[in-house]
C-alpha cells in the first residue's frame, strides 16, 4: 500500500517499483514481482538492480537461461556488481557449466576479494570437476575469510573423504 501511495504521488518513481518487486518476491508472488521490476525498467532502462532482481526471481522460478540473460544485462550496465557475478556463477553451476561458473566466481572475487561464499562455491565446482586439491584450497580461502563457515568445513571433509583421507576428513567434520 505504501508503494502505491508513493506511485500515486510520483508515478515515474522507479525505486518504488523495484522495492515493490522485492516485497512481492518475498511474498512468493514471482510473476507480479517481475512485472514490478519491468515497470521500474520502463522508467529507468539502465537500472542494474532491477535487472539483477529479475535474474534472482527467474532463478527462483527455475528459468536459468533467462536468469543468466538478466544477470548479463545487469553486468552490462554495472560491470562491478559482485552479487550479479556470484549469482551468475551459481546459476551456471546449476546448469552443469562448471568452467563458466568458476569464471564467474573469479570475476566476483576480482571485484570483492573477501566474498567467502564465492570461494566456497568455486570449491564445489572444482570438486565436481574432480580437481580435489584445488577445491580444498578454495574451501580454505573461505575459512580464511570466515573461520566459522560450517559448510566449508563440511566440504573439506567430504573432499578429503573422497581422496581416502578419512582421519583428516573426520578432523574437518569435527571443526
Where are these regions (language model features)?
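Canonical positions in the second alpha-helix
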Residues: 6, 39-40, 73-74, 107-108, ...
Amino acid at each position: 500500500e505504501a508503494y502505491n501511495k508513493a506511485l500515486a504521488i510520483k508515478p515515474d518513481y522507479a525505486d518504488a517499483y523495484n522495492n515493490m518487486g522485492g516485497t512481492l518476491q518475498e511474498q512468493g508472488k514471482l510473476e507480479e514481482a517481475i512485472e514490478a521490476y519491468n515497470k521500474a525498467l520502463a522508467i529507468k532502462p539502465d537500472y542494474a538492480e532491477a535487472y539483477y532482481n529479475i535474474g534472482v526471481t527467474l532463478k527462483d522460478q527455475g528459468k536459468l537461461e533467462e536468469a543468466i540473460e538478466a544477470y548479463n544485462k545487469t553486468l552490462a550496465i554495472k560491470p562491478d556488481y559482485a552479487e550479479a557475478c556470484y549469482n551468475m556463477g551459481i546459476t551456471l553451476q546449476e546448469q552443469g557449466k562448471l568452467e563458466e561458473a568458476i569464471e564467474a566466481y573469479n570475476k566476483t572475487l576480482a571485484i570483492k576479494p573477501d566474498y567467502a561464499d564465492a570461494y566456497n562455491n568455486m570449491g564445489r565446482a572444482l570438486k565436481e570437476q574432480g580437481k580435489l586439491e584445488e577445491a580444498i584450497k578454495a574451501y580454505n580461502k573461505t575459512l580464511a575469510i570466515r573461520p566459522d563457515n560450517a559448510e566449508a568445513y563440511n566440504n573439506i571433509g567430504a573432499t578429503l573423504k573422497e581422496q581416502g583421507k578419512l582421519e583428516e576428513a573426520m578432523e574437518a567434520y569435527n571443526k
